[in-house]
Amino acid sequence: MKVLKGSFRDACDVYGFIKYNPARDLRLPRFDKRREDIKHLYTQKEIDLILNKFSNNDTFTCVFLTSCYTGMRTGEVCGLTWDDIDFEKETINIQHNVYDKPKDGKGRWYIGTTKTETGTRKIHLSQTLKIALQNYKKKQDYFKKIYGKRYIYYNVEDVKNQSGKVVEHRIVREELSNKDSEKINLIFTRENGLYLGTDITRTPFKIIHNELGIKKCRFYDLRGSYAIKILNNGVEIRDVADLLGHKNIETT
């Protein structure tokens, strides 16, 4: 593409062989590898099988249900805090995305804004998910009392570059964080409060692949399955795009 555009530019602007450069506004189409992948569309039977298998794993069950009923991205689900959930108004405020970097002594999980500007959105909290999250919160509060001082809490601290500009926000255990850091009420943690970020789905999906025999499925595929489900229920494509945080319906 660079050679083609350069040749036409020289022919037009340098040598005057042509009056108009036909390659001036030429752009290669964006290639999104993930969109090229064959997605797995979960059946209700598979979802029921998975939920039954992990009925004793409250954290993964709630993570799985959250994606099933919202179509949120993996990093968005794992970045949810209790401050994002409004049980009274039955809404979820999606405003964070979690990602990892090589561990540097303080932690490897970072929290930022959503993937795109339209990714920041407020969606409805269904009754099924509401009840699941309320029950999960009760258990989490119970374990906080049981573990007492041994329970792990987290803060978010600013990461600055050499010029002193804040460039990222790192999730750090409370006892390791800076004085000016702020507490974060992460939802999906181990019973002792340990935060695993998106790794919370890793071991369960090995079991799903190897023991349940649902091959090649990914946690991310719940997003597409949710979109197909609500489309089949009559939701307009523009509304589906908004729920998923897509700017363009072509992405959806």
Located regions from the model:
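C-terminal catalytic core of Y-nucleophile DNA break-rejoin enzymes
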Residues: T91-N93, P102-K103, I111-K138, K149-I171, ...
